[in-house]
């Protein structure tokens, strides 16, 4: 941070609290108030960091004229709904998992794959799935998941294809169908 600031770069930090070393030397600091991250590999502030980056992007979009005030306000309204919707999403995820628990837990590896913005979702899903039920998992971009690893997929691999109905929807459906029909271990 010191070197970047000395070189004339505009710098900003996001930390769990105001008393961290980075917060104290940062010319612009955002306090996430997520609590102490006792272990470096635990990222309790990840979701808060993502949300803050999104909010900054919205504000910059408004300031630079890429968003109208009405669009900006609508996005802010959506953001305000997140805490309340979290409980419902958690319950839906639990119900989804319970209905598929046997299939998932008998698999030696869970593979998440998705196109476009769902690639990031597949990576995060793989991390969370390894953390929570503690089953080895990996995330691929849809194209990667179709052309390389699919020759190695077998009934031990549960491939979860994320599909938002976008331009890669047919490819996503094709991979899911292949895993369901040939290897009997795919979900969409």
Task: List each language-model region with its residue ranges.
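Glycine-rich phosphate-binding loops that contact phosphosugars or nucleotide phosphates
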Residues: 1-81, 115, 150-188
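Anionic-ligand anchoring segments at beta-strand to alpha-helix junctions in alpha/beta enzyme folds, i.e.
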Residues: 12, 105-154, 186
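Well-ordered alpha-helical segments embedded in enzymatic catalytic cores
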Residues: 52, 95-99, 145
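Ligand-binding beta-strand-loop-alpha-helix segment within the catalytic cores
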Residues: 77, 81-94
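A short, structure-level motif marking secondary-structure boundaries and short turns
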Residues: 85, 109-112, 160-161
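A short, well-structured juxtamembrane/interface segment
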Residues: 89-106
């Amino acid at each position: 941070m010191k070197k970047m600031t000395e070189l004339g770069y505009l710098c900003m930090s996001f930390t769990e609290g105001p008393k961290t070393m980075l917060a104290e030397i940062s010319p612009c600091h955002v306090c996430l108030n997520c609590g102490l991250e006792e272990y470096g590999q635990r990222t309790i502030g990840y979701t808060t960091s993502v949300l803050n980056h999104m909010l900054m992007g919205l504000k910059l979009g408004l300031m630079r004229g890429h968003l109208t005030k009405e669009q900006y306000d609508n996005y802010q309204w959506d953001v305000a709904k997140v805490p309340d919707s979290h409980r419902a999403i958690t319950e839906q995820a639990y119900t989804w998992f319970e209905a598929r628990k046997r299939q998932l837990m008998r698999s030696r590896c869970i593979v998440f794959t998705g196109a476009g913005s769902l690639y990031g979702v597949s990576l995060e899903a793989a991390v969370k799935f390894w953390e929570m039920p503690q089953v080895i998992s990996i995330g691929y971009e849809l194209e990667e998941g179709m052309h390389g690893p699919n020759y190695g997929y077998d009934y031990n691999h549960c491939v979860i294809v994320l599909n938002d109905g976008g331009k890669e929807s047919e490819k996503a459906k094709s991979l899911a169908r292949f895993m369901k029909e040939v290897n009997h271990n795919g979900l969409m």
